[in-house]
Amino acid sequence: MRIQVNAKGAARLLSRHLWVFRRDVVSGPETPGLYPVYWGRRFLALALYNPHTDLAVRAYRFAPAEDPVAALLENLAQALARREAVLRQDPEGGYRLVHAEGDLLPGLVVDYYAGHAVVQATAHAWEGLLPQVAEALRPHVQSVLAKNDARTRELEGLPLYVRPLLGEVPERVQVQEGRVRYLVDLRAGQKTGAYLDQRENRLYMERFRGERALDVFSYAGGFALHLALGFREVVAVDSSAEALRRAEENARLNGLGNVRVLEANAFDLLRRLEKEGERFDLVVLDPPAFAKGKKDVERAYRAYKEVNLRAIKLLKEGGILATASCSHHMTEPLFYAMVAEAAQDAHRLLRVVEKRGQPFDHPVLLNHPETHYLKFAVFQVL
């Protein structure tokens, strides 16, 4: 059995993009699985396939293989081998072991938290392979949890569930990140439990010192904890009371009495702080993905600009703005244009301190732009 694509679908795969949409599939099997993709008689790729979803074809290999399952699992073995050194050096840390398309393992994410793995599968073909995924992880971890509760699974016709695949899965684990420790709720936390893509950026922010810092969209205090090592007072803002409870717990875990939490809508709070004349030496903005799709980009641009504008107005002269976007639809040129426009409207000048992005364990494929989603930039406000 094979998948036949039209010229447009073939062009995408020949350019080494991994995705072909259903509208560009001419014919294919009726059941999801792993299949070869052809354009006429020409072999193009091996792919995860689901005829019932818009994103029908997800390529993982551009050469034929006798055993498609073995070829996919070889990609998994290679992804784990690329992380082996860091796991030996930092077994108590938090890292991404599998980054979906970035590791040629579309629809699969595996995160590592101090000896325990959390798996999320969002492509149908992975469902029957999860026991083999757990076995591949066995040499590296004490337990494996399948946290398959993402709503995107429903688009694939898959059930939502959370259950152990291997070993005894603890409710929570303690992760060491540089000089900071934090607790991860493996079953109930957002994503797989924490936001590991900002790990290196959180560590980078430890170099700054000052009186007052503001961490907006703080979640469980990720940036706030690192900032508290160098600032007299850090204010962590989030709209979730539960997230802030965890932030306070993490602050206590580290003996940090200088972290104060505020439950509030970020946009409303930033406007209020400006009216009250509050000023900060540093502001971190780590908002959610305002642009979930292409149709959201214009609205998202306005939202990102508004929150950056308000943050810039709160900064003292010489203060530091660290700002992020985790939407791949908000491209890098758009992101920097938005920040520049926000600075212009605030009548302030920004000096680039550093442009950053995803860490090594969230690899980017140049031919597949969707893998490059995280922008993180640090500016000095003049």
Swiss-Prot record:
Binding site for S-adenosyl-L-homocysteine: 202, 217, 238-239, 265-266, 286
Function comment: Specifically methylates the cytosine at position 1962 (m5C1962) of 23S rRNA.
Coarse class of the protein's main subcellular location: cytoplasm
Organism (species): Thermus thermophilus (strain ATCC 27634 / DSM 579 / HB8)
Active site: 326
Gene inactivation effect: Lack of methylation of cytosine at position 1962 (m5C1962) of 23S rRNA.
Entry's family note: Belongs to the methyltransferase superfamily. RlmI family.
The keyword Transferase appears for this protein: yes
Compartments, record wording: Cytoplasm
EC number: 2.1.1.191
Any one GO CC term of the record: cytoplasm
Keywords, alphabetical: Cytoplasm, Methyltransferase, S-adenosyl-L-methionine, Transferase
Protein name: Ribosomal RNA large subunit methyltransferase I
GO molecular function: methyltransferase activity; RNA binding
Membrane spanning stretches: none
UniProt enzyme class: transferase
SUPFAM superfamilies reported in the protein's UniProt record: PUA domain-like (SSF88697), S-adenosyl-L-methionine-dependent methyltransferases (SSF53335)
Residues in PUA domain copies: 3-60
Record GO biological process: methylation
Catalysed reactions, as listed in the record: cytidine(1962) in 23S rRNA + S-adenosyl-L-methionine = 5-methylcytidine(1962) in 23S rRNA + S-adenosyl-L-homocysteine + H(+)
Gene3D superfamilies in alphabetical order: PUA domain (2.30.130.10), RNA methyltransferase domain (HRMD) like (3.30.750.80), Vaccinia Virus protein VP39 (3.40.50.150)
Superkingdom: Bacteria
